[in-house]
Amino acid sequence: MNLEALCKEAELSFYDDELVSENGRKIYRIYVQKEGGVNLDDCARLSEILSPIFDVEPPVNGEYFLEVSSPGLERKLSKIEHFAKSIGELVKITTNEKEKFEAKIIAVDDENITLENLENKEKTTINFNDIKKARTFIIW
């Protein structure tokens, strides 16, 4: 099953998916994006496309709930493409060595992310494979 193609059919772009357990319930979440933002009708349209397919070809074993949503303003970055689409945004990164960064993403190539420190404007380049956890954030 090609989630990217199915999302495109609903005029959305696939961002990520995850399987989580909350209050003893298994939830399969699909995150999507769209120029101008995702609304409830977009999520419902994709859910209507996916539900009959998932009835025949379940994405996970056992009983689950399907959720379709946008990744939000403060979202997890887990793929190099996520970083590339987030150039200019603020990010919190924890590396595998437990170093922490709060910076602006200023450049991304095939394997490196270049950041600009928010306070001193110093630039740092991190290899994507050295990143344990990353998330965009907003200063309100």
UniProtKB/Swiss-Prot annotation:
A GO cellular-component term linked to this record: cytosol
Function: Required for maturation of 30S ribosomal subunits.
GO annotation, biological process: ribosomal small subunit assembly; translation
Principal place of residence: cytoplasm
Nucleus keyword on record: no
Keywords, ordered alphabetically: Cytoplasm, Ribosome biogenesis
Organism: Campylobacter jejuni subsp. jejuni serotype O:23/36 (strain 81-176)
Family to which the UniProt record says this protein belongs: Belongs to the RimP family.
Pfam family, one: DUF150_C
NCBIfam families for this protein: PRK14639.1
Localization of this protein: Cytoplasm
Protein name: Ribosome maturation factor RimP
The keyword Cytoplasm belongs to this UniProt entry's keyword annotation: yes
